């Protein structure tokens, strides 16, 4: 059994909540019949303790214990700030 902590990178799409952000994770999936790669997006609710993220920021997140009904990820660092 491995205890590797899952980390992902994505873009912030919402920061309207207090101490929470919504991060969109993009991945490419191959179509089973046609073989074309399709872009799929997963939205995750992430805990942002210091409210340091804004919309458009690229962030790194890691999995943690469930913090609420929908939040099981926490912010590690801001990789790139959005250009306003």
UniProtKB/Swiss-Prot annotation:
Keywords on record: Ribonucleoprotein, Ribosomal protein, RNA-binding, rRNA-binding
Record's function text: One of the primary rRNA binding proteins, it binds specifically to the 5'-end of 16S ribosomal RNA.
Signal peptide (UniProt feature, chain positions): none
GO cellular component: cytosolic small ribosomal subunit
Family matches, as Gene3D superfamilies: Nucleic acid-binding proteins
Subunit organization: Part of the 30S ribosomal subunit.
Record-level Gene Ontology MF annotations: rRNA binding; structural constituent of ribosome
Presence of keyword Cell membrane: no
Family: Belongs to the universal ribosomal protein uS17 family.
Organism annotation: Salmonella typhimurium (strain LT2 / SGSC1412 / ATCC 700720)
Alphabetical list of NCBIfam families matching this protein: PRK05610.1 (NF004123), uS17_bact (TIGR03635)
Protein name: Small ribosomal subunit protein uS17
HAMAP family: Ribosomal_uS17_B (MF_01345_B)
Record's keyword annotation contains Ribosomal protein: yes
């Amino acid at each position: 059994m491995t205890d590797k902590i899952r980390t992902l990178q994505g873009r912030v799409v919402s920061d309207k909540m207090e101490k929470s952000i919504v991060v969109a994770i993009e991945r490419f999936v191959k179509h089973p019949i046609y073989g074309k790669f399709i872009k799929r997006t997963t939205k995750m609710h992430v805990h942002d303790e210091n409210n340091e993220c804004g919309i458009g920021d690229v962030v790194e997140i890691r999995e943690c214990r469930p913090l609420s009904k929908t939040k099981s990820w926490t912010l590690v660092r801001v990789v790139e700030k959005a250009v306003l």
